[in-house]
């Protein structure tokens, strides 16, 4: 298909759908591995989330795939340790409803208000803090420290370096579809190195059944978890707009107009809330799959239906989930060194692309306070609720952007 022609369910496209799932697979399973969630549940919620998104945008379905969001790695990890999976999932449901609220406001007031309260001078540094806050966890995994201290430092560093090198080589020199799966290649290379060193335990795979129902977890709503999780949704909400622009450029179909952000954000939000209802990580649009669409010219959104169905089926393969649980921490740590840095650089790119002048005192103040308060570990505790990390940084940025006066020669966004 050389141009976008709308949704057309054809069984001959099923194999392409499986191929697209393969592209998303590495990043999809990485989030639950890092946050202590179930990888099989993540596969299931990615599948049903994508199908729900297609149902909501049925007037003009964009060819995109929804799966685990990297923006929520730090808050999910903290939430699981602090309140448990059930309460953290309550926060995920609420974060999805934040998307829904944004979609309703866009429906009522248009898209302009979104750029007013969330300009690049706020969004850029908030995205950067996500990567910076996560970086110590990656370093600890690479160095064999903390709870992951199951191997010698030499083993950890060697395996992490192999994983990292594989990702870099594929990103730099890969061609075609190979270039879209650097995470998967990094996991494969690191896993092979781990096998050579002899630190992989196959017991979980041997004892797992072929068919197994994922370990679903129902949400429990705890105010602290909800307050902590909702502000994190700001960054992926903006990322969603960027992905809609990207798929528009690839297909030459203006999805920002039809079905419009009011529908795509609604679909993304409800998919995230649905994921929280089952115990899965929040969903977001996957730019890797958009890249695959660009390379293959396979614009039919029904292909994503097959990718979603394949993800749901794989969620019930018990041995797959068990195999993913045997991946040693240094393998993941090596990949995370690069990915968390990339997240931070995406925030920097947001500032640069939009011409945010950091010599302007107003912008300098907003960026500086977001950084120091979010990364420095500041906590605002109001008893029943508290703000810290990325959520606190986002709150400070939004407040300062609305309160600080704009100069006549520069409006700040």
Predicted feature locations:
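Hydrophobic, membrane-embedded alpha-helices of multi-pass small-molecule transporters
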Residues: 14-27, 153-164, 181-182, 214-243, ...
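Interfacial segments of multi-pass membrane proteins
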Residues: 75-81, 171, 289-304, 310-315
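Transmembrane helix-boundary motif of multi-pass solute transporters/channels
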Residues: 16-53, 57-87
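Membrane-interfacial helix-loop connectors
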Residues: 32-36, 40, 70-83, 293-296, ...
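Intrinsically disordered, low-complexity non-transmembrane regions of multi-pass membrane transporters
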Residues: 1-15, 202-215, 249-256, 260-264, ...
């Amino acid at each position: 298909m050389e141009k976008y022609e709308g949704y057309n369910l054809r069984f001959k496209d099923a194999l392409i759908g499986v191929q697209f799932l393969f592209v998303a697979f590495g990043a999809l399973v990485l989030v639950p591995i890092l946050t202590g969630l179930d990888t099989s549940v993540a596969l299931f919620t990615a599948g049903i989330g994508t199908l729900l998104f297609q149902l909501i945008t049925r007037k003009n379905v964009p060819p995109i795939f929804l799966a685990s969001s990297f923006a929520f790695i730090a808050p999910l990890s903290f939430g699981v340790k602090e309140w448990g999976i059930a309460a953290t999932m309550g926060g995920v449901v609420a974060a999805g409803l934040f998307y829904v609220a944004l979609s309703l406001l866009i429906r009522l007031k248009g898209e302009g208000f979104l750029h007013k309260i969330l300009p690049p001078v706020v969004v850029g540094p908030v995205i950067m803090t996500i990567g910076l806050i996560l970086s110590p966890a990656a370093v600890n995994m690479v160095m064999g420290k903390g709870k992951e201290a199951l191997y010698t430092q030499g083993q950890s560093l060697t395996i992490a370096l192999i994983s990292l090198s594989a990702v870099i080589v594929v990103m730099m020199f890969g061609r075609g579809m190979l270039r879209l799966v650097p995470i998967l290649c990094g996991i494969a290379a690191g896993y092979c190195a781990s096998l050579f060193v002899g630190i992989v335990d196959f017991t979980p795979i041997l004892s797992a059944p072929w068919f197994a129902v994922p370990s679903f977890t129902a949400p429990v709503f705890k105010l602290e978890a909800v307050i902590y999780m909702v502000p994190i949704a700001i960054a992926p909400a903006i990322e969603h707009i960027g992905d809609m622009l990207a798929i528009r450029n690839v297909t030459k179909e203006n999805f920002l107009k039809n079905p419009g952000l009011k529908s795509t954000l609604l679909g993304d939000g409800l998919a995230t809330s649905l994921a929280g209802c089952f115990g899965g990580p929040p969903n977001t649009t996957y730019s890797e799959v958009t890249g695959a669409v660009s390379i293959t010219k396979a614009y039919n959104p029904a292909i994503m239906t097959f990718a979603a169905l394949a993800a749901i089926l794989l969620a019930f393969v018990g041995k797959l989930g068990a195999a993913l649980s045997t991946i040693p921490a240094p393998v993941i740590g090596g990949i995370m060194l690069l990915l968390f840095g990339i997240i931070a650089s995406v925030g920097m790119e947001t500032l640069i692309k939009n011409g945010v002048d950091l010599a302007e005192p107003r912008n300098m103040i907003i960026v500086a306070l977001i950084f120091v308060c979010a990364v420095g570990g500041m906590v605002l505790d109001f008893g029943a609720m508290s703000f810290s990390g990325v959520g606190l940084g986002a709150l400070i940025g939004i407040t300062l952007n609305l309160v600080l006066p704009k100069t006549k020669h520069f409006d700040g966004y």
